[in-house]
Structures are given as C-alpha cells and as structure tokens.
Amino acid sequence: MSLKQNYSAADIQAWMISNLAELLGVDGDEIDATVNLESYGLDSAQAMVLVSKLEQLLGFQPSPLLLWHYPTIESLSERLAEELEEQSEEQNTDSATANHSNGTPVLDLQAEVVLDPVIHPGGAIPVDFPVTQPKKVFLTGGTGFLGAFLIRELLQQTQADVYCLVRAADAQAGKAKIQTNLEGYAIWQEEYESRIIPVVGDLAEPLLGLSSTQFQALAAEIDTIYHSGALLNYVFPYSALKAANVLGTQEVLRLACQIKVKPVHYVSSVAVFESPVYAGKVVKESDDFSHWEGIFLGYSQTKWVAEKLVKIAGDRGLPVTIHRPPLIGGDSETGIGNTHDFINLMVKGCLQMGCFPDVEYMLDMSPVDYVSKAIVHLSMQKESLGKAFHLQHPEPVSLSVLVDWVRSFGYEIKTLPYEEWQAELINNATSVDNPLYTLRPFLLERWSDEQLTIPDLYLKAKRPHISCQDTLKALAGTSIGCPPIDGKLFMTYTAYLIQTGFLTLA
C-alpha cells in the first residue's frame, strides 16, 4: 500500500473518470461525473476493482459503501478528498472503520417504515378470494433462484396461470427469460409454457414499471400475489437496495389493494432478527421483530423495513402470510443450485485460499425444493393467513462438519482462527479470481463502537435460535419435509458443482 498523497477533488475525479472508462471498456468522454454510477451497470465485482485501484492511489482503502452513499463521481471525489484531509499521516492498515466514522450515514430504520396511507383494502371490492384454489397468480422474482422453483410448485400444486413480473424489452423476451431461468435449474417442462404470462415491468419502479392503465388491469385480473422478488447483495448498502426491496414491496401491496382484495404471500428472511437484542434467544414464528438496532447489512435492513410494511398492510386488513427462509441451498434431488450464493462462494473461495475459518457457526440452510414446496402449500391454507413461517432447517450442522466433508473429497485445507483467516483473506483474495473478493466488504467492513465485522458481531453476540416448530406443525401430515444436512446431501451438491466446473476435483 502506498503512502497517502494529497489529491484534490478535481484530481480524484479525473482519475476516476479515466479508470472507470477503462474498467467498462468505453471512452473517457462517455463518462459523466454527475451521473449515478449505477447507470453504468457497475456490479459488485467491478466496484471492488475500483476500490482496490483507489487504495493504490490514495494510500488507504475507502469503504466500498461510499460508492453508493455518494453515487456520482463528482460527489464521491469530494468525499474522498475530505477523507484524505481527515486521515492522519500515519499508515492506516485498518481501512474499514465504524459506521459513525467511515463516511456512511447512520440510518434510523424505524423512520423508513412508512406505508402510503392510500394503500388500504377498504377501498377495494371485498371478494371471497380463492385461498385454496387460486386461478390467476401474480409472482415477483420469477427470474431468480427461489422464484424459479416457486413457479414450478405453483404450476404443479395449482391449476393457476402464473403472471410473472420480468424486466425485458417485450413480452416475448420476458417469457424467454423466464423459460431460460427454469431451464438453467433443469425444472422447465414444455406444458408450463401456456400457463406462464410475462408482465414486463420493474420491481424498483413506481407501479412496478407499469402504466396506470396496465397496473389497474393487472389488479383486476389476478387473485393472489406471491412476492419473492428482491435484490440480494451482501455489499450494497440500504440506499442501493431500497428501491427494489422496500419501495417495490410497497407497490406490490398497492396492487393487492387495487380493484379487489388479493392476499399477499411475502417471502421475507430470518435476517429480520439480526439485531443483537435477539442474540442467543429462541425466536418463534409469532414473535415480534420490533428491534432494528444493530442490523448493519444493507440487505437485512431492507428486509426488516419491507416486512414491517407488510405487517402494516396486514393490520389495515389485507390478508397476508410471511415466509422467512434462511440461506437457501440447491435442489436436494439434483444438487442444482445457485453458484453465486454465499455458501458456494465461501466454499470455493476458501478452497482457493486453502483454509476455512475455525468458528462456531451453525449451517442452517434449507434446500430450495423444500422451501418452495412449503411456501406454496402453506399459502393455500386458510389458517395460514395472518401468520409467519420459519423455513429454517430444523437440524442444522456446524461449519466444522462441512469442512470435514470437504476434506473427505481429498481437498487439503486447514482451519484458522477467524482473525488469522481474515488476514489470509486480505492477503490472498486480492482480485476477482477469488470468489471471496466481492464479499470482502461484508467479511471485513467494521461496524459498531467495538469495531467488529458483521461475522464478528454474529460470533461474539451469538445468533438467535430461529424456531421452526410451528411451521413443522403446519406441515405435519404432508409429504413436505426438510432433507437432513448429511453426507448424501453434501455429495449431491458437490457432484453438481464439480460437474458444472464450478469446483475442480482435488
């Protein structure tokens, strides 16, 4: 790392324009310093490359979150110039600081919980909605991982047509996008084609990206809503995720209250209980989630606020159910999963480094086929309305068991105390060649007065114990059960990852 240099905001701005243009493969005159960086399609991997180059220029690593809190090159350059002045001349090797001093504003999540007062089922036609036999279902998130399996379950468990919100140029391209997604997970069947209706729009836009006329027509057509769409990112702050995850949820609730009342089945997350207030406690499905203090991950913050909006709508009389999955694993039958999810990136990245962290972490992921089957079944039970469900794995295993399974495949890996593993991460995951590179902000960014990373906070304060007993009771008597996390499941997952080339044989 170089010594800190004195650069003006103009110097930094000129440097950023040049380097962003190089990163994106465009001419420098195509970069406008006053335009939001997101408009250039900057993803988390490219953002980390830019941060690394900034570190070499400035002599300290700026918080990656600054790229979203100061979203234009002009505003970011001004902030970085201020940070240069604020920095002492001594070498700063701990670049990530507490959120009161890392340049990111402190956020009051409770103040974000504001649902448009016009969103109220009282103004819609009260109908005897077909909870157990939906006819026309509207689904968000259908081009995602869980969403693909929800489409399959809705088509298999019901006779309904599924209207899928999709970003695309037109309906034909939208349907092709949905089909390609299902094909990617090997769950597409030709008979699905006639029952999938693409709705071209955008979760992050007002009225879901539809015109007022289109929005009203959709509200009149559908009878049930499954809202699983969300932007999942472990690096982006709340501000970058709010439009899709929070405001998008508000628009879904608006749709549910237009023309006629439609039940909303919302896919939330167990992350709503990340506040240290719940640390070490048993949290049941019916427990309140009023505490937000100490939730630092932007994605988790948006899920907390969004679920609060759903709860407000429920209090206003809208029929809702809430489904809280944990980390979601691949299909327990085929092993097919999302190779970009946290667990797979962690495993591959740790294998490349040759070490795993030696931590007391319980692996509680649930296979996607279990999660999707449970959500669709539970949503069609009248007694489910107004309730929340936990799709947590009922029998989690420790991370050490995963490490033992990895070793059984012949991989030579060691375990290190978490602090030593973090040092290895800093020294070895220095480019996008290692999957952990894009997760560095999540794994290394320091928060709170104690200067702890998010994993540190979990490990020190202990995670809550998410109870799923009420959910298991609701599923009793069905064939829906959560497969055990055992050697068979690990073999199924690993075989798929090796077959696709995501992992290589030891």
Swiss-Prot record:
This is Polyketide synthase HetM. The keyword Transcription does not apply. InterPro entries: ACP-like_sf (IPR036736), Far_NAD-bd (IPR013120), NAD(P)-bd_dom_sf (IPR036291), PKS_PP-bd (IPR020806), PP-bd_ACP (IPR009081), Thioester_reductase-like_dom (IPR010080). It holds the Pfam family PP-binding. One of its GO terms (molecular function) is oxidoreductase activity. The gene is hetM. The modification O-(pantetheine 4'-phosphoryl)serine is found at S44. It comes from the Bacteria. Disulfide bonds: none annotated. Keywords: Antibiotic biosynthesis, Oxidoreductase, Phosphopantetheine, Phosphoprotein. SMART domains: PKS_PP. Its cofactor is pantetheine 4'-phosphate. Residues 10-84 form the Carrier domain.
